[in-house]
Amino acid sequence: MSRNICLVGMMGAGKSTVAELLGDRLGRRVADTDDEIRGWTGRSIPELFMEHGEEGFRELERQVVEELATFHDLVVSLGGGAVLRDDNVSSLLLTGVIVHLDVPVEVLVERLRDGGADDRPLLGGPGGTEEELLERLRSTGKTRDPRYREVADVTMDASGPADQVAEDVIAWALAQTDVLTPSEHEQVMT
């Protein structure tokens, strides 16, 4: 049995994409906390924020994280604010390692400016100038980045192509004793 690989980072860091690539490469199930919440509730993330506020959404997120922490051998893509709660971090560390995908704010703006902010309520949804998006990301990053670094087992530069980031995560995991199974070691070494 191996530990879950839990990806954290700012919105636009590539967590969902890298998680899918890792899942394919390692033969692991991928769980995206936002997708799980949408599946549980039948509602979009912006709808949940409007109906229940951020605190109500965070409680749903906590329940999803707690449930996912009962499994092993997952790749988990976490919402950007999931690790702000200590109880989520405690749950994740029971069966997983936390990998922080770090991306400069300017790269995040590039990734989000063409509609990528639409379903991200903490960015204020669509519209606004690139400068406004940059300022919102800087403000959000100012509070979140120190927390990501605090809780992560490793911080990785994720500003490059997603396939390279996934390979970097695998290289790190290979150097750990309890992240990959022996068969996963063999699989990625061939």
Segment roles from a protein language model:
Residues 15:
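Conserved lysine of the Walker
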Residues 32-93, 114-118:
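ATP-dependent small-molecule kinase phosphotransfer cores
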Residues 94-145:
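A glycine- and Lys/Arg-enriched "phosphate-lid" helix/loop adjacent to the NTP-binding pocket
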Residues 10:
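P-loop (Walker A) phosphate-binding loop of NTP-binding proteins
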Residues 80-82, 104-106, 161:
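Short glycine-rich anion-binding loops that position phosphate/pyrophosphate groups of nucleotides
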Residues 2, 25, 110, 142-190:
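NTP-dependent small-molecule kinase module
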Residues 7:
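Hydrophobic anchor at the beta1->P-loop junction of P-loop NTPases
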